[in-house]
Structure formats: structure tokens, C-alpha cells
UniProtKB/Swiss-Prot annotation:
InterPro entries: MpsC. It comes from the Bacteria. It comes from Bacillus subtilis (strain 168). This is Uncharacterized protein YrhF.
């Protein structure tokens, strides 16, 4: 168990809860070289699940969940993330599979962060 990954997951969970009203139920993160790869389970709120019952609704929820997160991170890195990682966040790639309620985010930093090849589920 890595305290660093646990704290990283908490930053992600807190931000998404503030932004969408619901954070992921479970997050699994691995550090690989200069990347943190996070798989997020149980992301959608009850209202998002209701909206996603139609193809148009799924598209709307997908756009909101991906574009909004990427836009937010491009404007301001979440508080404490760069300090925790000891590196600057340079890119975020994010996608969500609405039907499965699973999202993946790849955080790319300006230097190597995986010294200990850490992985943790929380």
C-alpha cells in the first residue's frame, strides 16, 4: 500500500465529487514512468444514469464527463497534486464508458514519478 497513491486517489475523488456531485466509488491507480493511470469505477450520479438511458443522453453525459474534466485540469491543476507528485502535470487524457460506468484517466507529468512502481486500490 502506498500512501502517495492513496493521497493521489483522494485528490481525484474530491475534485470529481465537487464537480459532478458524485465521486467514483473505487479508484485503482498505477504509476508508470511519468504517468499516473487511474481506472475509476462507479462514477455516474443517479441523474446521469437516468439521462444516459437514451443514445443522445449517453453522448451528453460522455461529453460532460470527459470535456469538463479535461478543461478544468488544463486551467488549474487540482490543489496538492503537483506537490504530492513532485512533478508538473502537463497533460490529462480521460475517457468514460457510460454503459459500464468505468472511466480511465492518464495524467502525464514532466518527469518520472514511478520510482517504486507503486499500485493501490482504494
Amino acid at each position: 500500500m502506498s500512501k502517495k497513491i492513496h493521497e493521489f486517489n483522494d485528490i481525484i475523488r474530491k475534485l470529481r465529487k465537487e464537480l459532478f456531485g458524485k465521486g467514483p466509488e473505487r479508484i485503482h491507480t498505477v504509476f508508470v514512468e511519468n504517468m499516473a493511470v487511474s481506472t475509476l469505477y462507479g462514477n455516474l450520479s443517479a441523474s446521469e444514469q437516468f439521462i444516459a438511458r437514451t443514445p443522445e443522453g449517453r453522448e451528453m453525459v460522455h461529453a460532460a464527463r470527459t470535456s469538463l474534466i479535461q478543461d478544468l485540469y488544463s486551467k488549474q491543476t487540482p490543489e496538492g497534486m503537483e506537490e504530492l507528485m513532485g512533478a508538473k502535470l502537463v497533460h490529462l487524457f480521460s475517457d468514460i464508458k457510460i454503459e459500464e460506468n468505468i472511466a480511465v484517466s492518464v495524467f502525464v507529468f514532466d518527469r518520472k514519478i514511478d520510482e517504486q512502481k507503486e499500485a493501490l486500490q482504494s
